[in-house]
Amino acid sequence: MTRVKDPEKLPDATGVYIFRDRDDRVLYVGKSISIRKRVSSYFREQENPRLRIMMRHLESIEYILTQNEKEALILESNLIKRYRPPYNVRLKDDKRYPFIKITDEEYPRVLIVRTIGRDSARYYGPFTDTGAVRRTLKLIKSLFRIRSCRRMDGPCLNSQIDLCYAPCDGRISREDYREIIEKVDLFFQGRYQEVIEVLEEEMKEASERLEFERAARIRDQIESIREVMERQHASFTDSIDQDIVALERGGDTSAVVVLQIRDGKITGKDDFILRGSAPRTEILEAFLKQYYAIPRRVPSEILTQYPVEDGVIAEWLSELRGEEVKIHSPEGGAGRRLLNIAWKNASVILKQKGRVRDALLQLKDDLKLPEIPRRMEGLDISNIAGESATGSVAVFIDGKPSSGSYRRYRISAQGPDDYAMMRELVERRYSSPELRKPDLVLIDGGKGQLGVALEALKNCGVHVPVVGIAKKREEVYLPGLSEPVDVDDGALQILRHLRDEAHRFAVKYHRTIRDRDSLESELDGIRGVGPVRKRALLEHFGSLDGVRDASVEELASIPGMTREVAERIHRHFSGDLAG
């Protein structure tokens, strides 16, 4: 890369330019068919206050020449992702969104990941709804029985309860397994009808070969996929593939919503927050470059709220898709109606974001924090008289739950000693020097719990702001103050939400541990019920009460369960212990 200070020394050629400050930090990355003309324009434009601030910090300019504008676009996108310059319009915190990964192993797995590796695996995402991704992955595994184990050391629990084809045990050929993975691939592309057509052909062949059990299984797969399709109830007459992209801007923050239409049905919605002050068309183009730079299915048509003036974006997307991609902004008709739906969603998201931002600012003032608490962690303990004690950490980023960052702990402290349990939780959470430190720690409890948490943090050598919130009167306590502090309603609402999330997560884990222990103890004396069936019962029915209330037919329907053992379990809980 070549570096200059005088813009007149820049080449009149296509490429990428990089603004750096006196500490060599990257301020901004851009592309142009004429680097000299584009960079010179920054020195003339003085209306944008954000631009004026950037130019005051500018110390040097680097440039990289490319053969054409498409190469420049790809390089610009990669450099923005690498350096995350403060003055570029960019997706906020995009790393925390999950992806679906289909691995490139001999027998591929399907995983949820948060980064894209430099490998030949297939990735889908990012997805903004982590819960929906987990539910979808669970459905995929139950439908297609793909492997989950990292190592193929032999048959595992899933193969024993008929949830995996067990390629580790040679029960399925590589070719047959790859055909299953291709169906999974189509599913994540939203091409449900194609999956159904393939499965219907397989069901027909199985019936002709008198493989009725296999045919019935395929029939159930088809019904499950049709249920997914029915949930995507909004549909159109044309079987089209489109992305509908609309944005709403407020100050230096913009919300963008993408409606995904596959085979004429709305199959998904993604929403993103972008940082950076720029004209709406520039924000839109910056979003498109970042959104599609991540491996994902590119539709044949992209409808945008404003015309996209940079023609190289469509050229680049067409190359990614392998055929022409049209980007246009319809004036009316169904396309404009869809854009209005996306825009209304973006407007609501931006308003909510504004309210949360105001509440975080108020929280900073009310709690006398050194900075806005962008990352907050709430800690809670759940137990009954010291039994099955668990601890949880809920994480909020910019006022919203980041459920993928939640953590839970099995507490080893003995007896009903809440202080000892909180001390253990804090020390286990913050003892690692690699852990990202939060801007605020919230303890579910009053002055006593707050004092214990402070002491534990001190033992860990961690110095972060800590507050406690008492359940009884929703009072907020700061270290060193005997009386609770006044907190604005909006700010208090965020603290309550964080406290409630930590409590919910701790209680959920506590119940899981308690039910598992109770179920294992209750089933110990029943002949034919070993560890595998115990786990299958808990996973299927969720609790001891669920097993107790189940009929013989429901018990027998669990994969790997015989009717004889199901009847034995049912008799046990009915009070008839014979047999």
Swiss-Prot record:
Transmembrane parts of this sequence: none
Main subcellular location of this protein, as a coarse class: cytoplasm
Single GO biological process annotation from the record: nucleotide-excision repair
Key words, A-Z: Cytoplasm, DNA damage, DNA excision, DNA repair, Excision nuclease, SOS response
A GO term from the CC aspect: excinuclease repair complex
Any one Gene Ontology molecular-function term assigned to this protein's record: excinuclease ABC activity
Family in the record: Belongs to the UvrC family.
Subunit record text: Interacts with UvrB in an incision complex.
Protein name: UvrABC system protein C
Annotated organism of origin: Methanothermobacter thermautotrophicus (strain ATCC 29096 / DSM 1053 / JCM 10044 / NBRC 100330 / Delta H) (Methanobacterium thermoautotrophicum)
